[in-house]
A protein has these predicted regions:
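Non-catalytic C-terminal interaction segments of nucleic acid-processing enzymes
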Residues: 2-35, 110-184
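A short acidic/basic microdomain associated with nuclease active sites
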Residues: 34-51
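Conserved beta-strand termini and adjacent loop/short-helix elements that scaffold enzyme active sites
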Residues: 43-44, 101-103, 121-123, 129
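Anionic group-transfer/hydrolysis microenvironments
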Residues: 46, 59, 72
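A short, well-structured beta->alpha microelement
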Residues: 52-53, 75
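Active-site beta-strand-loop-beta-strand hairpin of nuclease catalytic cores
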Residues: 56-68
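Catalytic cores of nucleic-acid endonucleases
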Residues: 66, 72-121
Length: 184
């Protein structure tokens, strides 16, 4: 954990406000992805069929890379996550890069499965605790900690595009703000 997450006395910083809900943390994760170069982002409100059964809390795409953020509000939720098939068999999961987002104290770097990164939500902002790559590393194949299930990602994207077509989103993008705001 870097110094930004510790108090001068060595304790862990806590949020000044009440703990965030799962929905609030998912929205924070999506904003964070958009602010970090992921121009196509889906929140947990978007439900799509995938071949692996995974329903990401936040999934972002940029040229050459995908990033999954899994939100955890409690330690028990984090521990239960390990039982999911796409966690025990990472090749079945989505995201070339995968991160947990939680409030400080729920998950530590020592708790992370191999290849996973950690982000903390502190006072409405996301702090990069472990594993967030530099801008040039996103597309370097050997730097990617996971080989994402590209079929599942394509299923997910197809479902999104199909919904746009069904809803009649205009070619000139006039409805783009509505789509981004409401998660399709």
């Amino acid at each position: 954990m870097d110094g930004a997450e510790q108090t001068p006395g060595g304790g862990v910083m806590q949020n000044a406000r009440h703990p965030k809900t799962h929905r609030e943390l998912c929205e924070l994760a999506c904003r964070f992805l958009r602010n970090n170069g992921f121009k196509v982002v889906f929140s947990d409100r978007f439900h799509a069929w995938t071949s692996c059964g995974e329903h990401p809390d936040a999934l972002g795409f940029r040229n050459g890379a995908s990033c999954l953020i899994e939100v955890k509000c409690s330690r028990s939720d984090f521990l239960a996550d390990r039982k999911k098939v796409f966690r025990s068999e990472p090749e079945k999961g989505m995201g070339d890069w995968r991160f947990y987002l939680c409030e400080p104290g729920v998950i530590t770097v020592a708790d992370l499965p191999a290849g996973w990164g950690l982000l903390y939500a502190i006072n409405g902002r996301v702090r990069k605790v472990h594993g967030w790559p530099g801008n040039h590393q996103w597309v370097v194949t050997v730097a990617k900690p996971f080989r994402a299930n590209k079929q599942a990602e394509c299923d997910y994207l197809f479902s999104a595009l199909r919904r746009l077509e069904i809803r009649g989103v205009t070619e000139n993008g006039a409805d783009a703000d509505r789509v981004q705001t409401y998660g399709l």
